[in-house]
Structure formats: structure tokens, C-alpha cells
Amino acid sequence: RIMIDCSHDNSNQDYRNQGKVIEDITNQISAGNKSIFGLMLESNLFSGKQKILDNQAEMDYGISVTDGCIDWEETQNLIKNLAKNI
């Protein structure tokens, strides 16, 4: 059994490709793949990433400081679509 990371290498290091990865996972599960038991998404309130600034008051709330992330709305849509199609 396997849990698939939709980001990092599976998205070619581009967080915006996570939707393509979850679509492929959806197709695999729909086709009968029983090996996949879960997935991981890089997600935050708002998309993208930012550097940690000395003056943290200048930083944007809800944007990752580590890996680039999809936003909350896209996260909800991807998960709802997965649930609807498996």
C-alpha cells in the first residue's frame, strides 16, 4: 500500500501541477488500483511561497514559508472532485 505525495518530484517541483497528479491518482483508483490508500497535498490559505523576512510584519499571512502551496479553494475543489469520482 502506498500514500502518494502530489507535490515535489511528482509535480516536477511545481506546486501548481498537483491537480494533474491528483487527477492521475483519481483515474488509477477508479480503474481499480487498491494499492493507493492516501495522498498528500502542499496546501495553505493562499497559493505560493514567501521568504521569511527579518521584519515578519511585512510578510503575508497564510502563505507558506517552506514549499510552494496551492490555495485553500483549489484544495477543496481537488478533494471534492476526488471524492466524487472514486
Which role does the model predict for each range below?
Residues R1-I86:
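Expand to "…catalyze enediolate/carbanion chemistry for C-C bond making/breaking, isomerization
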